[in-house]
């Protein structure tokens, strides 16, 4: 009898560990897909621009599509800093783009910041980051990439201690040569970057699919939930650096039919000609990114993970592209500030909902953590808003 009791007592910790593992596995996975410089109106399902995005249209129909989402500071690094910290730039310390001009002022994501990824790491999540990071400032001697050879250096490696819980890492700082992108892998040192003869979003999706499928059972612990960020650079400039198969989709579009707006300057003007030269390639980039989103979702379904995975798609900011006589972002017109934002979670989020709620890019920090069951773990210093109830259609 004593022996039986002893054996039973010894089993209790093992059983408890098993139950705990099951509880962790029941937590939702997260796939967060982010583009760069994608205007909020540029989705096929909205019918406002001549862009084709069938996979994103489908994703929008499977969850909630926020049609008034905004980037509070429509510049890459500050927006990304707000997303990661849930704090506005004066508190996140990312007050401008991370480059050699801002580096002397300490403009980069602090190692001490408590990011949403740090919270998930502490809750037992496996974390992966693939693509553009742009939250570390370059330091001398600058790495040998072409965008570090001008007056301002842009590109920098992110060492492990600054990755905020992401243990699987295939990323770069900022590098806009989309047809021959460069990366550092997880264990690479600063000088061990490599270039790929493949369109960036396609390569990043290949690697994301490997992570989701957990190729060779080596990329993550299959017994734990995971969160994966796929940060694609297009449709950021250069717009023209996109595979021909996507350009071909827009070959027969009369560009003047997409320039019928009073905020687009006339043909023959500097800004008007820039828009006409760029817009169809911009759409081609979006259609290409859309195809990669479809591949990621297909892999989730093939692995039986889709139902309990939160899938989010958004952008750090929009793009003026010559509208309002302005090229680029960093301007408070809708074309620069408004962004796409959609969230799907088949187990919890009702489908086919368009929401006019004005949600900010940075609100995703507390909203996603709360949605995933970690409301109590949101740091007190987070300044943005938990809108998870609106995502779940509870208010």
Describe each PLM feature range:
Residues 2, 19-395:
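Formylglycine-dependent sulfatase
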């Amino acid at each position: 009898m004593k022996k039986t009791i002893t054996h039973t007592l010894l089993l209790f910790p093992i059983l408890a560990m098993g139950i705990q593992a099951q509880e962790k596995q029941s937590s939702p996975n997260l796939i967060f897909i982010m583009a760069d410089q994608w205007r909020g109106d540029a989705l096929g399902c909205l019918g406002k621009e001549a862009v084709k995005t069938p996979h994103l249209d489908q994703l929008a129909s499977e969850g909630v599509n926020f049609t008034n989402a905004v980037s509070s500071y429509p510049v890459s690094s500050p927006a990304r800093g707000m997303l990661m910290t849930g704090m506005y730039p004066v508190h996140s310390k990312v007050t401008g783009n991370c480059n050699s001009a801002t580096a002397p002022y300490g403009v980069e994501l602090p190692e001490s910041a408590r990011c949403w990824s740090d919270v998930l790491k502490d809750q037992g999540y496996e974390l992966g980051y693939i693509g553009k990071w742009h939250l570390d400032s370059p330091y001398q001697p600058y790495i040998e990439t072409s965008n570090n050879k001008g007056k301002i250096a842009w590109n920098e490696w992110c060492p492990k201690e600054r990755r905020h819980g992401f243990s699987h890492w295939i990323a770069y700082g900022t590098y806009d040569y989309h047809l021959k992108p460069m990366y550092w892998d997880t264990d690479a040192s600063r000088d061990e970057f490599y270039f790929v003869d493949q369109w960036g979003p396609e390569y990043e999706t290949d690697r994301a699919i490997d992570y989701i499928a957990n190729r060779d059972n080596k990329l993550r612990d299959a017994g734990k939930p995971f969160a994966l960020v796929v940060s694609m650079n297009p449709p950021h400039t250069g717009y023209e650096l996109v595979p021909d198969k996507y350009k071909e989709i827009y070959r027969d579009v009369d560009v003047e039919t997409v320039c019928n707006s009073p905020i687009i300057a006339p043909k023959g003007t500097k800004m008007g000609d820039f828009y006409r030269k760029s817009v169809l390639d911009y759409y081609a980039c979006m259609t290409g990114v859309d195809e990669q989103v479809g591949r990621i979702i297909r892999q989730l379904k093939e692995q039986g993970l889709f139902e309990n995975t939160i899938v989010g798609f958004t952008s750090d900011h929009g793009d003026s592209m010559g509208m309002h006589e302005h090229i680029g972002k960093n301007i408070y017109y809708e074309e620069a500030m408004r962004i796409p934002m959609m969230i799907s979670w088949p187990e919890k989020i009702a489908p086919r909902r368009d929401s006019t709620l004005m949600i900010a890019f940075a609100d995703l920090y507390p909203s996603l953590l709360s949605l995933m069951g970690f409301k109590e773990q949101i740091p007190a210093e987070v300044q943005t808003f938990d809108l998870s109830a609106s995502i779940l259609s509870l208010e």
